[in-house]
A protein has these predicted regions:
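Glycine-rich helix-loop-beta junction characteristic of Rossmann-like nucleotide cofactor-binding loops
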Residues: 64-68, 116-119, 143-145
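Nucleotide 5′-phosphate-binding alpha/beta core
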Residues: 1-36, 45-48
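Conserved AMP-binding A3 loop
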Residues: 32-61, 68
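Conserved beta-loop-beta connector loops within the AMP-binding
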Residues: 196-210
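Short phosphate-binding/catalytic loops that engage adenosine nucleotides
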Residues: 44, 96, 172
Length: 210
Protein backbone atom coordinates (compact mmCIF):
# COMPACT_ATOMS: atom_id res chain seq x y z
CA UNK A 1 0.00 0.00 0.00
CA UNK A 2 2.73 2.49 0.93
CA UNK A 3 4.77 1.52 -2.09
CA UNK A 4 2.43 3.51 -4.31
CA UNK A 5 1.85 0.77 -6.90
CA UNK A 6 -0.88 -1.34 -5.29
CA UNK A 7 -4.65 -0.71 -5.52
CA UNK A 8 -6.03 1.63 -2.89
CA UNK A 9 -7.14 0.00 0.36
CA UNK A 10 -10.70 0.74 1.49
CA UNK A 11 -11.06 0.60 5.27
CA UNK A 12 -14.61 -0.51 6.10
CA UNK A 13 -15.72 -2.94 8.85
CA UNK A 14 -17.91 -5.81 7.67
CA UNK A 15 -20.88 -4.59 9.71
CA UNK A 16 -20.79 -1.23 7.89
CA UNK A 17 -20.63 -2.39 4.29
CA UNK A 18 -23.26 0.24 3.45
CA UNK A 19 -20.43 2.76 3.57
CA UNK A 20 -18.89 1.28 0.44
CA UNK A 21 -21.09 3.53 -1.70
CA UNK A 22 -19.94 6.63 0.18
CA UNK A 23 -16.35 5.54 -0.30
CA UNK A 24 -16.83 5.31 -4.08
CA UNK A 25 -15.75 1.69 -4.41
CA UNK A 26 -15.32 0.79 -8.06
CA UNK A 27 -14.97 4.39 -9.21
CA UNK A 28 -11.86 5.69 -10.91
CA UNK A 29 -9.48 7.48 -8.54
CA UNK A 30 -6.00 8.95 -8.81
CA UNK A 31 -3.20 6.42 -9.08
CA UNK A 32 -1.35 7.87 -6.09
CA UNK A 33 -4.23 7.23 -3.65
CA UNK A 34 -3.20 4.48 -1.24
CA UNK A 35 -6.02 4.51 1.32
CA UNK A 36 -9.68 5.49 1.31
CA UNK A 37 -11.05 6.00 4.81
CA UNK A 38 -14.46 7.17 5.94
CA UNK A 39 -14.81 10.60 7.49
CA UNK A 40 -16.63 11.09 10.78
CA UNK A 41 -19.71 12.56 9.11
CA UNK A 42 -20.07 15.28 11.74
CA UNK A 43 -20.67 17.96 9.10
CA UNK A 44 -22.70 15.82 6.70
CA UNK A 45 -22.94 12.29 5.33
CA UNK A 46 -19.74 10.23 5.67
CA UNK A 47 -17.52 10.33 2.62
CA UNK A 48 -14.24 8.81 1.57
CA UNK A 49 -11.07 10.70 2.39
CA UNK A 50 -8.46 9.74 -0.20
CA UNK A 51 -4.97 9.61 1.24
CA UNK A 52 -1.77 9.15 -0.72
CA UNK A 53 1.14 7.00 0.37
CA UNK A 54 3.26 10.15 0.57
CA UNK A 55 0.77 11.82 2.93
CA UNK A 56 0.50 8.76 5.17
CA UNK A 57 4.27 8.34 5.35
CA UNK A 58 4.86 12.03 6.04
CA UNK A 59 2.27 12.01 8.83
CA UNK A 60 3.82 8.95 10.48
CA UNK A 61 7.34 10.34 10.23
CA UNK A 62 6.27 13.71 11.64
CA UNK A 63 4.53 11.99 14.56
CA UNK A 64 7.64 9.98 15.41
CA UNK A 65 9.81 13.09 15.15
CA UNK A 66 7.59 14.89 17.65
CA UNK A 67 7.38 11.91 20.02
CA UNK A 68 11.12 11.28 20.17
CA UNK A 69 11.63 8.62 17.54
CA UNK A 70 10.05 5.48 16.07
CA UNK A 71 8.86 2.80 18.43
CA UNK A 72 6.45 -0.07 19.00
CA UNK A 73 2.73 0.67 19.00
CA UNK A 74 -0.21 -0.80 20.89
CA UNK A 75 -3.29 -0.82 18.65
CA UNK A 76 -6.17 -0.20 21.07
CA UNK A 77 -8.62 1.56 18.75
CA UNK A 78 -10.54 0.12 15.78
CA UNK A 79 -8.16 -0.46 12.84
CA UNK A 80 -10.67 0.86 10.30
CA UNK A 81 -10.79 4.33 11.89
CA UNK A 82 -8.12 6.85 10.94
CA UNK A 83 -6.61 6.62 14.44
CA UNK A 84 -6.11 2.87 14.15
CA UNK A 85 -4.90 3.14 10.58
CA UNK A 86 -2.37 5.76 11.67
CA UNK A 87 -1.04 3.34 14.30
CA UNK A 88 -0.63 0.69 11.60
CA UNK A 89 1.19 3.08 9.26
CA UNK A 90 3.49 4.29 12.03
CA UNK A 91 4.32 0.67 12.82
CA UNK A 92 5.18 -0.04 9.19
CA UNK A 93 7.40 3.05 9.04
CA UNK A 94 9.10 1.99 12.28
CA UNK A 95 9.64 -1.54 10.98
CA UNK A 96 7.70 -3.03 13.88
CA UNK A 97 4.60 -5.17 14.30
CA UNK A 98 1.88 -3.54 16.42
CA UNK A 99 0.43 -5.38 19.39
CA UNK A 100 -3.35 -5.47 18.98
CA UNK A 101 -5.77 -5.15 21.87
CA UNK A 102 -9.06 -6.52 20.58
CA UNK A 103 -11.71 -3.86 21.20
CA UNK A 104 -14.47 -5.37 19.06
CA UNK A 105 -16.40 -6.28 22.22
CA UNK A 106 -15.32 -3.22 24.19
CA UNK A 107 -12.22 -1.89 25.92
CA UNK A 108 -11.09 -4.34 28.61
CA UNK A 109 -8.59 -2.54 30.82
CA UNK A 110 -7.52 -5.78 32.49
CA UNK A 111 -5.83 -6.77 29.22
CA UNK A 112 -3.71 -3.62 29.07
CA UNK A 113 -0.79 -4.71 31.29
CA UNK A 114 -0.08 -7.89 29.35
CA UNK A 115 -0.54 -6.16 25.99
CA UNK A 116 1.91 -3.42 26.93
CA UNK A 117 4.38 -5.98 28.23
CA UNK A 118 4.30 -7.62 24.78
CA UNK A 119 5.59 -4.41 23.22
CA UNK A 120 9.04 -5.30 24.49
CA UNK A 121 11.84 -2.79 24.97
CA UNK A 122 12.54 0.49 23.23
CA UNK A 123 10.15 3.38 22.76
CA UNK A 124 6.50 2.40 23.18
CA UNK A 125 3.31 4.25 22.33
CA UNK A 126 -0.44 3.89 22.08
CA UNK A 127 -3.42 5.95 20.93
CA UNK A 128 -6.66 6.13 22.94
CA UNK A 129 -9.80 8.21 23.24
CA UNK A 130 -10.56 10.05 26.46
CA UNK A 131 -13.19 7.51 27.56
CA UNK A 132 -10.62 4.71 27.33
CA UNK A 133 -8.12 6.68 29.38
CA UNK A 134 -10.77 7.42 32.01
CA UNK A 135 -11.65 3.74 32.24
CA UNK A 136 -8.00 2.73 32.51
CA UNK A 137 -7.49 5.16 35.38
CA UNK A 138 -10.02 3.18 37.44
CA UNK A 139 -7.73 0.14 37.36
CA UNK A 140 -4.38 0.42 39.21
CA UNK A 141 -2.64 -2.19 37.05
CA UNK A 142 -3.80 -0.59 33.81
CA UNK A 143 -2.80 2.84 35.09
CA UNK A 144 0.69 1.61 35.98
CA UNK A 145 1.04 -0.05 32.58
CA UNK A 146 0.13 3.15 30.72
CA UNK A 147 2.67 5.05 32.83
CA UNK A 148 5.39 2.82 31.37
CA UNK A 149 4.72 4.08 27.83
CA UNK A 150 6.68 6.93 26.30
CA UNK A 151 3.46 8.57 25.12
CA UNK A 152 -0.28 8.00 25.18
CA UNK A 153 -1.94 9.92 22.36
CA UNK A 154 -5.44 11.11 23.24
CA UNK A 155 -7.91 12.24 20.58
CA UNK A 156 -11.34 11.58 19.19
CA UNK A 157 -12.93 14.48 21.05
CA UNK A 158 -12.44 16.79 24.03
CA UNK A 159 -10.38 15.37 26.89
CA UNK A 160 -11.83 16.57 30.22
CA UNK A 161 -9.31 18.38 32.39
CA UNK A 162 -9.91 16.13 35.46
CA UNK A 163 -8.95 13.07 33.40
CA UNK A 164 -5.81 14.77 32.08
CA UNK A 165 -4.87 15.85 35.60
CA UNK A 166 -5.41 12.35 36.99
CA UNK A 167 -3.29 10.86 34.22
CA UNK A 168 -0.49 13.33 34.88
CA UNK A 169 -0.62 12.58 38.60
CA UNK A 170 -0.27 8.87 37.78
CA UNK A 171 2.83 9.51 35.68
CA UNK A 172 1.16 8.90 32.30
CA UNK A 173 2.66 10.93 29.46
CA UNK A 174 -0.44 12.16 27.66
CA UNK A 175 -0.15 13.90 24.30
CA UNK A 176 -3.36 15.69 23.29
CA UNK A 177 -3.92 15.40 19.55
CA UNK A 178 -6.12 17.05 16.97
CA UNK A 179 -6.72 16.01 13.37
CA UNK A 180 -9.14 14.39 10.97
CA UNK A 181 -9.33 11.70 8.33
CA UNK A 182 -8.30 14.17 5.62
CA UNK A 183 -5.04 14.97 7.46
CA UNK A 184 -4.06 11.29 7.85
CA UNK A 185 -4.91 11.51 11.54
CA UNK A 186 -3.41 13.75 14.20
CA UNK A 187 -1.70 16.85 12.84
CA UNK A 188 -1.54 18.97 16.02
CA UNK A 189 0.09 17.61 19.20
CA UNK A 190 -0.45 19.51 22.45
CA UNK A 191 -1.53 22.56 20.47
CA UNK A 192 1.53 22.61 18.19
CA UNK A 193 1.19 21.55 14.52
CA UNK A 194 3.46 18.74 13.40
CA UNK A 195 6.23 19.71 11.00
CA UNK A 196 4.78 20.13 7.53
CA UNK A 197 1.22 19.84 8.82
CA UNK A 198 -1.59 22.07 7.54
CA UNK A 199 -3.41 21.69 10.85
CA UNK A 200 -3.93 24.19 13.61
CA UNK A 201 -5.46 23.90 17.06
CA UNK A 202 -9.11 24.83 17.42
CA UNK A 203 -8.27 27.56 19.91
CA UNK A 204 -9.79 25.80 22.92
CA UNK A 205 -6.89 23.51 23.70
CA UNK A 206 -9.18 20.54 23.26
CA UNK A 207 -8.52 17.60 21.01
CA UNK A 208 -10.06 16.14 17.91
CA UNK A 209 -9.11 12.95 16.12
CA UNK A 210 -5.84 11.12 16.49
Amino acid sequence: MLGGSDPALVAVPTQHESLLGALRVGEQIDDDVALVVTTSGTTGPPKGAMLTAAALTASASAAHDRLGGPGSWLLAVPPYHIAGLAVLVRSVIAGSVPVELNVSAGFDVTELPNAIKRLGSGRRYTSLVAAQLAKALTDPAATAALAELDAVLIGGGPAPRPILDAAAAAGITVVRTYGMSETSGGCVYDGVPLDGSPGSANGSGETGLR
